[in-house]
Regions:
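Alpha-helical membrane-targeting segments
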Residues: 1-21, 76, 83, 98, ...
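Membrane-anchoring hydrophobic helices of lipid-metabolizing enzymes
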Residues: 1-61, 105, 201-230
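Residue-level preference for the first positions of well-ordered beta-strands
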Residues: 42-44, 63, 113-117, 146
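Catalytic core of membrane glycerolipid acyltransferases/transacylases, capturing the structured
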Residues: 42-96, 141, 157
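Short, charged beta->alpha transition segments
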Residues: 74-78, 100-108
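Active-site and donor-binding regions of nucleotide-sugar-utilizing enzymes
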Residues: 95-99, 127, 153
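Catalytic-site beta-strand/loop segments enriched in glycine and acidic/polar residues
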Residues: 104-141
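A cross-family acyltransferase "interaction/gating" segment
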Residues: 130-189
Length: 230
C-alpha cells in the first residue's frame, strides 16, 4: 500500500527528469503525425515494448489511452501512467483483454481527438511482432496506426525477453514517426494479417534505423551499449 501511494509520484518525476535530460537531435517526419491528427482527429501510436521508456513521457504528454493489466503489478503501472498524463483501460492478453480492447475502441469512437498508445508486442512478446489488437482498433475506429520509434546514442540494454533498454541520462536521442497505416472497415482476415505483417516490417525497419544512427547493432547487446562511432 505504501509503495502504491508513494511509488508512482516518485517514479513519474524520475522518468520525466531522466528523459528531459536527454537531447532530441532528430525528430523525423513529425508532419505525418500532425497531418493525420488534423485530418482524422485521432490516431493509434504503436511502438515496441523494448522502446517504451522514452514514450512514457512522450506519449504521456499527448494524453493517450493505454491498456494496462489488472494484475498486482498493473496497479502500480496504472498509477504511474496516470501521473505521467495517460488515460487507461484495464486488461491484458491473459485477463479481461477483449473487454478492455472493446472499451478502448468505444472510447476512441466517441471522443474526437482521442489517441491510443500501444506497446504493440507487449507485454510478453514474441518480440517485435505486432499483435492483432492494434489492427482491430484501427479497423473498427477508422483511425490510422502511426509507428513511433526512438534510439539513443548511449543506452543500457537489459537481458529481458525483448532486450528492453534505457537511454543513459544526457545522451542524444532520435525519434522517428512512421507513415500512417489504415485498415479498411471491410478488411477480411487475410487482409488484416497482410497489414499486420506490413506494420511489423515497417516498425522493425524504423527500429533498426534508430539503432544504426550512431553505429549500434539491432536490438543491442545486454549491458552498457555505447556507439561504435561518435
Amino acid at each position: 500500500m505504501m509503495l502504491l501511494r508513494l511509488g508512482p509520484p516518485i517514479g513519474a518525476r524520475s522518468v520525466l527528469a531522466w528523459n528531459r535530460s536527454c537531447r532530441v537531435v532528430v525528430r523525423e517526419h513529425e508532419e505525418r503525425e500532425l497531418s493525420a491528427l488534423q485530418r482524422y482527429g485521432g490516431c493509434i501510436y504503436a511502438t515496441w515494448h523494448q522502446r517504451m521508456f522514452w514514450f512514457f513521457s512522450d506519449f504521456g504528454s499527448r494524453h493517450v489511452t493505454m491498456m494496462i493489466s489488472r494484475s498486482k503489478d498493473g496497479e502500480y503501472a496504472n498509477a504511474l501512467a496516470l501521473r505521467l498524463g495517460f488515460y487507461s483501460v484495464r486488461g491484458s492478453n491473459s485477463f479481461n483483454g477483449r473487454e478492455a480492447l472493446s472499451e478502448l475502441i468505444e472510447l476512441l469512437k466517441k471522443r474526437q481527438g482521442h489517441k491510443a498508445g500501444m506497446m504493440a508486442d507487449g507485454p510478453t512478446g514474441p518480440p517485435r511482432q505486432l499483435k492483432m489488437g492494434s489492427i482491430r482498433i484501427a479497423k473498427e475506429t477508422g483511425l490510422p496506426i502511426i509507428p513511433m520509434m526512438y534510439g539513443a546514442k548511449r543506452r543500457i540494454v537489459f537481458k529481458s525477453w525483448d532486450r528492453y533498454f534505457l537511454p543513459l541520462p544526457l545522451t542524444d536521442v532520435v525519434v522517428l514517426h512512421g507513415e500512417p497505416v489504415f485498415v479498411p472497415s471491410d478488411a477480411d482476415e487475410k487482409e488484416c494479417e497482410r497489414l499486420r505483417r506490413l506494420v511489423t516490417d515497417r516498425m522493425n525497419e524504423m527500429a533498426d534505423r534508430c539503432d544504426a544512427w550512431w553505429g549500434g547493432e539491432p536490438l543491442g547487446k545486454p549491458g552498457f551499449d555505447l556507439p561504435l562511432k561518435t
